[in-house]
Amino acid sequence: MNTFQMRDKLKERLSHLDVDFKFNREEETLRIYRTDNNKGITIKLNAIVVKYEDKKEKIVDEIVYYVDEAIAQMADKTLESISSSQIMPVIRATSFNKKTKQGVPFIYDEHTAETAVYYAVDLGKSYRLIDESMLEDLKLTEQQIREMSLFNVRKLSNSYTTDEVKGNIFYFINSNDGYDASRILNTAFLNEIEAQCQGEMLVAVPHQDVLIIADIRNKTGYDVMAHLTMEFFTKGLVPITSLSFGYKQGHLEPIFILGKNNKQKRDPNVIQRLEANRRKFNKDK
């Protein structure tokens, strides 16, 4: 499977939509946009081809579903009927776009050195990121949006699965509701897990649809956590960060796990290596 074949496959699978396609050969991207208002999304074909080797048709099904929902929600409609319970926070990498394609600033806040909090209108099977142009229609201020979103994320179910590896306990929150990573903002939930931990508590949001919490009880646990975060980071549809965070009494601190049972707090040399790796990953996508 190459990018041209993937382009053709996606165009065939999306032929039921009233959209146009624009293929960029140099960047290996496919833009899919509505014919009525030209709103759409751009897909990096190279990244999908890489994932196709492992996931086969499953990754195509995921992309088609994602495009279906996104295109449907891009129809021009009023936001006046949106209720406060539909305002949610979403976690993104600090490198995520700060403005819409039309140049309108998104509403967002800094979170950690690796993550930022954006805000969205929940639309059922998808959501729409809130930008400054939407505030008037929503009849909300930025502060009200922040408060509503944090209130709503705390109401989400926090069910999880656990796994023990070499004496270390790992918790996986993977409800696939679009807000798994957002649960990192639920301090009460994190404190609840912290109270159960016997070792150092680490937290990770490698992509949008998973939150990993680890109770690191021995040195092997750091290596396992590093492997897990990188594995999830490279396979997520919306990658966030491959870095883990130390968690203590409501405070998150990014750490870099060097491998072979070592870890290092964030310093300039570590930052340079991380940024170099991230640029390479984004280029490969």
From Swiss-Prot:
This is UPF0354 protein SAB1603c. It holds the Pfam family DUF1444. It comes from the Bacteria. HAMAP family: UPF0354. Belongs to the UPF0354 family.
